[in-house]
Amino acid sequence: MAAVVAATALKGRGARNARVLRGILSGATANKASQNRSRALQSHSSPECKEEPEPLSPELEYIPRKRGKNPMKAVGLAWYSLYTRTRLGYLFYRQQLRRARNRYPKGHSRTQPRLFNGVKVLPIPVLSDNYSYLIIDTQARLAVAVDPSDPQAVQASIEKEGVNLVAILCTHKHWDHSGGNRDLSRRHQDCRVYGSPQDSIPYLTHPLCHQDVVSVGRLQIRALATPGHTQGHLVYLLDGEPYEGPSCLFSGDLLFLSGCGRTFEGTAETMLSSLDTVLGLGDDTLLWPGHEYAEENLGFAGVVEPENLARERKMQWVQRQRMERKSTCPSTLGEERSYNPFLRTHCLVLQEALGPSPGPTGDDGCSRAQLLERLRQLKDLHKSK
């Protein structure tokens, strides 16, 4: 009987949440339209035009972010252009790096390495909530760094492990993922810097395309093109077959535990296609994200899908971890399919919660993309409690 009462209560709460979500979306849409009108009036009434940073190409979309801890917290197209295309962005990153080192001298989270048969994955907490990674061939003593934003922290881990850094894999150009490329590549003369040529990766030496493979010792790492967060965003898939273990996905800012990255340089359709790329991987694939966003993301997932018991169980585990400042990564893609709303745009429960969309639903790409965009709007407005 208690279970029946609880289920009934959850169902009622879900209906209330659906009404609230539709109201928020309506307000957000109206506010966005008002902002667009204001910008149009300002552009026509301005007596003179000052030199502006080089804008993003017309087909790209920038969605402002509400205030938060992420280095991308400042909003606006002009700021994004400055952050990614000028020295001001680098100086801002250096300021964030100094502050994080002072606040978290031992890192923002306590991490645990994963050991396989001759392979070690070591998460390195950097900045206020980022993760860099060392992927180590323990027999050859060779290491690959993923998104080494703090060269000091990454170098300390390299020395502690007693390995030789031979490659840097950069998921995208943002300084909180690429800021350590220069120092580490200079310190390790044989180190190659891999990334997308579309993304202006600092100190890039070896451009990668979709499905290219980087081989280091027994490490076989495949690059997958996943544009949306940036034009040239890549994720990296470590093949588990050579070491007879699970494959590992280093997802940068594409996919987080119960969340996904914001669409700074693309459309909802682009981001949906990129998410579908990783959805095609196996359920046992380990997800190593670029940020520690688990608790906030699961809180939002509970707003849009309050009856999801998998989300509730994961949230309880995450809260226990974070009370002790323990890292929440990795999760698995199988887990993410069960509670991550950005991977569940095909689910009827989300379609009902966010309201009807024009045209067919289900597997139709356009309608799923529209649902993804609505989820993103809500996530940007969401404040965890």
Curated annotation (Swiss-Prot):
Protein name: Probable thioesterase PNKD
Region (Disordered): 31-57
Sequence ranges of Polar residues compositional bias: 31-42
Family according to the record: Belongs to the metallo-beta-lactamase superfamily. Glyoxalase II family.
Superkingdom of the organism of origin: Eukaryota
EC number: 3.1.2.-
GO biological process, one term: methylglyoxal catabolic process to D-lactate via S-lactoyl-glutathione
Reactions this protein catalyses: a thioester + H2O = a thiol + a carboxylate + H(+)
Record organism: Bos taurus (Bovine)
UniProt function note: Probable thioesterase that may play a role in cellular detoxification processes; it likely acts on a yet-unknown alpha-hydroxythioester substrate. In vitro, it is able to catalyze the hydrolysis of S-D-lactoyl-glutathione to form glutathione and D-lactic acid at very low rate, though this reaction is not physiologically relevant in vivo.
